[in-house]
Amino acid sequence: MDLWAQIYLLDEGARLGKNITQFRERYFIANTHGGHFTDYKPKDDAEPTVLKAISDICISMKAEDYLELPQCIEHEIPVILDDKVKKEYAQFERDLLLQIDENTITAQSAGVLTGKLLQFCSGAIYDNDHKVVKLHDCKIDAYMEYIERLNGEPCITFYGFQHDKERILQALAKTKLNVRVYNGPDDEDLWNAGKIDVLLVHPSSCAYGLNLQAGGRHIVWFTPNWSFELNDQGKCRLWRQGSPYDKVYVAYLVVQGCVDEDVMAAIKDRTDTHETVMRVLKARIQKLKGEI
């Protein structure tokens, strides 16, 4: 969508239309829910058609095509729930979703519901009074095992919920590692100076613009995030030009058989966040109803 204005400045609308409305009508579909506009989705042939239209004045290149970047190795770390917790998750999901009519789900309600399932996977959840209820240590144990395997190498940890951060801090307090929560430029400087072993970061607070490549080569996502853009930009805090390392490692802690796997599938497909969350939730509701 942002491409129209850039091309208009070059050709005054000759290739992509004289105004943004023409561009949208030609290359996008307006999504609605319950009669209300939600967002725009590119038509199936939008990308190749647009690229062909502007090919005589533009060249499309990925950063890795023209920059010297380290190799980026992404991998998933399977987290297995014990039998007791697995049954509790299944019951929690049923109780949460079976009361919902999949035909009336909105992007907002889907985000809230999948957020609760992601919290369960992480090991704690906010109750109706916004108090934290601890559920299990399966993911935190897997995280600490991963940190131990790094043998002291610095690591950026992306967390999703405030209770994730607090439980991670409690677990790391039992080690001799120097741990910081990212709060601003001072932490960026300390990280790049090699004075932080584990830097806890919420993805929305530093996914853009920060140069952290000098301080380490490891990233771990404690809580998978639906947004491909946030994942991609988070990775680029270390995977960027000027890194002193030849490899950068990005790990994802993924609870098996649960919503974590749906999030990872969405990231790999690079699909629209809101639409994907709604589709995944509807599929889970339909599956549960089919089991009754």
Language-model-derived ranges and their functions:
Residues 5, 211-224, 248-251:
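A short beta-strand element within the Helicase C-terminal
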